[in-house]
């Protein structure tokens, strides 16, 4: 079966614990990550090492691109301009840093050079913006999914660059002109719970649902800031509509509350 996992953000121990739980119950599990492997969390280096070793375009572990990976790709162009012109660190021309902490991680890992950065830049640049997947559910129905980091725009004629930006950054959850079910991350359900304007089935710190929309970003990296909420790393099974999490299993509850057929 196929499982979509939310934003990792350097939470290596949570990621490994969740993968172990899923794979102990389903040895043939196929895993799709929604991007944002980096920044904020305690073990970005370990997450990156694991990702480069295991994630491929069509293998057991797959992924789409997150906005944090995209921001690094944009920063890399500035870094290379600086490197080609300055050649080394200079007080007059300080090295450009990433908006978040990726460049500091690279520096700490001894990778802050064109050669050192290349494997990570290659990995990020080959992550697709979205994936379409069709599965047969446990009840025998065929369901089309769109796996994306943030949102998918179904209006015809949308320019590619606009679609890519939407895939990475937009927050229009549930407004889809398609029968596909969009599974995404990007906005932690903790944050969505604070937005009174959003008519959204919010379960703070857990996977949340709207019409044709599943948000798997439970905000794992923020769990210390929100001790009153579960705030865990979660996974959604495309075939059974069940959830998996490292700390608790709530699949039966969610299966009874949400289905693409109502």
Identify what each model region corresponds to.
Residues 251-262:
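Positively charged, low-complexity/disordered segments
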Residues 209-249:
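Binuclear metal-dependent phosphoesterase catalytic core
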Residues 9-13, 39-42, 68-73, 155, ...:
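Active-site environment of divalent metal-dependent phosphoester hydrolases
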Residues 5-6, 31-35, 62-67, 148, ...:
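Active-site neighborhood of phospho(di)ester-bond hydrolases with catalytic His/Asp-centered motifs
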Residues 92-215, 219-226:
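Acidic, His/Gly-enriched loop-helix segments that form or flank divalent-metal centers
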Residues 40-132:
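Active-site neighborhood of divalent metal-dependent phosphoester bond hydrolases
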Residues 1-50, 54:
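N-terminal active-site segment of His-dependent metallophosphoesterases
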């Amino acid at each position: 079966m196929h499982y979509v996992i939310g934003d990792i953000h350097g939470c290596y121990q949570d990621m490994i614990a969740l993968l172990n739980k899923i794979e102990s119950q389903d040895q043939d599990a196929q895993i799709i990550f929604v991007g944002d492997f980096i920044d904020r969390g305690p073990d970005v280096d370990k997450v990156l090492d694991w990702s480069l070793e295991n994630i491929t375009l069509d293998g057991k572990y797959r992924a789409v691109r997150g906005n944090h990976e995209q921001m690094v790709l944009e920063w890399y162009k500035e870094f290379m301009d600086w490197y080609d012109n300055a050649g080394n660190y200079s007080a007059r021309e300080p090295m450009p840093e990433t908006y978040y902490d990726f460049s500091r991680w690279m520096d700490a890992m001894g990778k802050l050079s064109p050669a050192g950065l290349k494997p990570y830049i290659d990995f990020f640049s080959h992550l697709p913006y979205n994936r379409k997947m069709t599965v047969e559910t446990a009840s025998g129905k065929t369901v089309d999914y769109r796996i994306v980091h943030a949102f998918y725009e179904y209006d015809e004629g949308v320019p590619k660059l606009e679609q890519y930006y939407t895939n990475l950054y937009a927050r229009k959850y549930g407004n889809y002109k398609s029968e596909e079910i969009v599974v995404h991350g990007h906005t932690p359900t903790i944050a969505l719970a604070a937005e009174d304007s959003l008519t959204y089935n919010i379960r703070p710190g857990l996977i949340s649902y709207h019409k044709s929309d599943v948000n798997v970003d439970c905000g794992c990296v923020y769990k210390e800031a929100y001790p009153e909420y579960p705030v865990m790393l979660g996974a959604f099974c495309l075939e059974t509509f069940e959830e998996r999490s490292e700390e608790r299993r709530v699949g039966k509850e969610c299966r009874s509350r949400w289905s693409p057929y109502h």
